[in-house]
């Protein structure tokens, strides 16, 4: 994800939880 955290803040708008 873009930022290390538990919120949907990536380019896809899904909850990735900073896994990618």
Curated annotation (Swiss-Prot):
Q: Can the keyword Secreted be found in this entry's annotation? A: yes
Q: Does the keyword Secreted apply?
A: yes
Cellular localization per UniProt? Secreted
Query: Where on the tree of life does the source sit, at the highest rank?
Result: Eukaryota
Q: Which UniProt keywords apply?
A: Ion channel impairing toxin, Neurotoxin, Secreted, Toxin, Voltage-gated sodium channel impairing toxin
Tissue-wise expression: Expressed by the venom gland.
Please classify the protein's predominant subcellular localization into one broad category: secreted
A GO term for molecular function: sodium channel regulator activity
Which GO cellular component terms are attached? extracellular region
> Can you state the subunit structure given in the record?
Toxin b is a heterodimer composed of toxin alpha and toxin beta.
Cited function: Binds to sodium channels (Nav) and affects the channel activation process.
**What name appears for this protein in its UniProt entry?**
Toxin b subunit beta
Source taxonomy: Eukaryota, Metazoa, Ecdysozoa, Arthropoda, Chelicerata
């Amino acid at each position: 994800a873009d930022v290390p955290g538990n919120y949907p803040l990536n380019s896809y708008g899904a909850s990735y939880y900073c896994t990618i």
